[in-house]
Amino acid sequence: MSPLPFRQQAAAPRLPTHYRLQTEPHPSGEAINALLISCGEPTHPEERWSLALSRSLWQLSIVDERDQTLVGFIRATSDLALNANLWNLAACPGDDQNALLNALLYHALARLKKELPGCSISISAPAIALEGLKKQGFILDPGGIRAMGLRLR
């Protein structure tokens, strides 16, 4: 029996020059929302980001070292038993967007596999990330499984 494809790790992608991957400090809610807006993704109230980050296992950010702008982001949550979830995957549109997405995915998955090796991993991601997810072994909606969300008001 061959190992599941998402458990195999692809080669580590290189970040383009002048970008830095970091876990600390956490980006501000304002910076995360600015990134999400640039990606055409929905934003959240700035004050809710500190709560979301405090309830996350960790977050990974990519910062442009030239102007210290947040250009990539992803965060992880888990029940620490069976399930891990990756949220808010975003990378600034432009020539480096795919490289930034691939770096975030690679490092997030490597960390989850190391820290929570038995967990199933799900991800909420924009359509532009599909190719990178497939390279990491993800299968789009395997067996017809569909994720659903409910926005609470």
Label for each model-derived stretch:
Residues 2-47, 144-148:
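Short amphipathic alpha-helix that is part of the acyltransferase structural core
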Residues 44-66, 70-90:
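A conserved beta-strand-loop-helix scaffold within acyl/acetyltransferase catalytic domains
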Residues 89-99:
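A short, internal acetyl-CoA/4′-phosphopantetheine-binding micro-motif in the GNAT/acyltransferase core
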Residues 97-111:
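Conserved acetyl-CoA-binding loop-helix of GNAT-fold acetyltransferases
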Residues 112-125:
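Conserved GNAT acetyl-CoA-binding A-motif
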Residues 129-133:
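Short, charged/polar "capping" segments at the starts of alpha-helices
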Residues 135, 148-152:
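C-terminal binding/interaction regions
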Residues 135-144:
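Conserved acetyl-CoA-binding loop of GNAT-fold acetyltransferases
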